């Protein structure tokens, strides 16, 4: 399970380094094989261990290619999916179109989301957090029944 945020860097060869605390689990669970794709709701990337990604692929495969909305989702998510394999030092190459989608430069945030990671430009992540907290505090975000039942 992946949680928390880690400030990492994109090196001159367009690689990120997965923090040490996650590497052992990733090598044990998926031999460091991962898949990265675009997030369709935010300017960030989604990075999945291969077994988690395979579950997503099955769900996408079950969508109808004859339904325009479902086909578009398949095209965007699958069309941007890129296999990534961690090297022994925990580095992953992020390809150009993916870097462009998330406007990645040197300073990057790796955000644990339990079964996957989000990869953000550092200032975009900070802005997202500030806006999100502000919307919650101001009541702009209506809490659903499920959220009201959540006790933190």
Swiss-Prot record:
GO terms for cellular component: cytoplasm; nucleoid. GO terms for molecular function: DNA-binding transcription factor activity; transcription cis-regulatory region binding. The keyword RNA-binding does not apply. It comes from the Bacteria. One of its GO terms (biological process) is negative regulation of DNA-templated transcription initiation. The keyword Cytoplasm applies. Residues 5-52, 81-124 form the SpoVT-AbrB domain. Its main location: cytoplasm. Keywords: Cytoplasm, DNA-binding, Repeat, Transcription, Transcription regulation. It is found in: Cytoplasm, Nucleoid. PANTHER family: TRANSCRIPTIONAL REGULATOR MRAZ (PTHR34701:SF1). Belongs to the MraZ family. Forms oligomers. This is Transcriptional regulator MraZ.
């Amino acid at each position: 399970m992946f949680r928390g945020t880690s400030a990492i860097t994109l090196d001159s060869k367009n690689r990120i380094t997965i923090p040490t605390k996650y590497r052992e689990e990733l090598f044990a669970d998926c031999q460091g094989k991962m898949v990265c794709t675009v997030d369709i709701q935010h300017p960030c990337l989604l990075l999945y261990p291969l077994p988690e990604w395979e579950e997503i692929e099955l769900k996408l495969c079950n969508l109808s290619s004859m339904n325009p909305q479902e086909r578009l989702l398949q095209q965007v998510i699958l069309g941007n999916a890129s296999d990534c394999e961690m090297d022994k030092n925990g580095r992953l190459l992020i390809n150009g179109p993916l870097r462009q989608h998330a406007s990645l430069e040197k300073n990057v945030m790796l955000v644990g989301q339990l079964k996957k990671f989000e990869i953000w430009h550092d200032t975009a992540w900070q802005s997202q957090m500030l806006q999100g907290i502000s919307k919650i505090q101001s009541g702009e975000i209506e809490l659903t029944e499920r959220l009201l039942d959540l006790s933190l």
